[in-house]
Amino acid sequence: RILANLINNVTSLDTLNHELGHCVYDLGISTELPFLDRKASSPAVTEAIAMMMGDIIKIENVLDKIVPDELLERFKMTHKEDEASFVAKSLLIIDFEREIYTNPEQNPAELWQNLSKKYLNRENEQDNEWASIPHYLSHPAYYQNYFRANLMKVQIYNYLKSVLGNITENYKSAEFMDKNIFRYGASIEEYELIKQLTGNEFSASYFCEEL
């Protein structure tokens, strides 16, 4: 069961695919594992799978028969820009949280302004935009998982594509991911799982090469 506020647009389609990514991961975890291992390898890995599923509408042919060619091409071209933007915004959010815990007496609006200039090259007046980030309260210190997941998902997807082709067009994709990723749950540490799956150590180079 998924709780999500959806409307008829691509952002909601991304959201739905993202949450379904979490679902298929959880469903694929072996029930024969010890109870404490019946969860994702790490928050970053389950986010990587979810983010990869969210990206499917831009990196595979899911919408080819639905959206006009010219519009679809422009839509897919936004993917790299979105990826670069996400990295910059993530670094802003993560750095702000670290700095505010290090020195909680400082002015958060001033800190946000300085970091916005550093990471986004954005000059803005001091305000409380930082307070609009729900993760600071709901999931403290969690955003670094999204950042690492954004790197992991590319390495995972590139490997899956090398074996399966477009994963949405290969009926063996679900079985392959169940067998090689999901079923292990938390019995394998996140970086060990990446290496076992792809044959290579976790690296940001795969993400950088995609930009």
Which positions does each model-derived feature cover?
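Active-site-proximal binding-pocket segments
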Residues: 57-61, 79, 91-95, 99
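Short beta-alpha connecting loops at secondary-structure transitions
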Residues: 2-3, 34-41, 76-81, 134
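Active-site metal-coordination segments of metallo-dependent hydrolases
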Residues: 36-49, 82-85, 140-146
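C-terminal, non-catalytic "cap/extension" segments appended to globular domains
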Residues: 16, 24, 52, 74, ...
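Short pre-active-site segment immediately N-terminal to the catalytic Zn-binding motif
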Residues: 1-17
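Catalytic Zn2+-binding segment of zinc metalloproteases
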Residues: 20-33, 57
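Post-HExxH zinc-binding segment in Zn-dependent metallohydrolases
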Residues: 40-75
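Short, glycine/acidic-rich hinge or "gate" loops at secondary-structure transitions
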Residues: 32-38, 63-71, 164-171
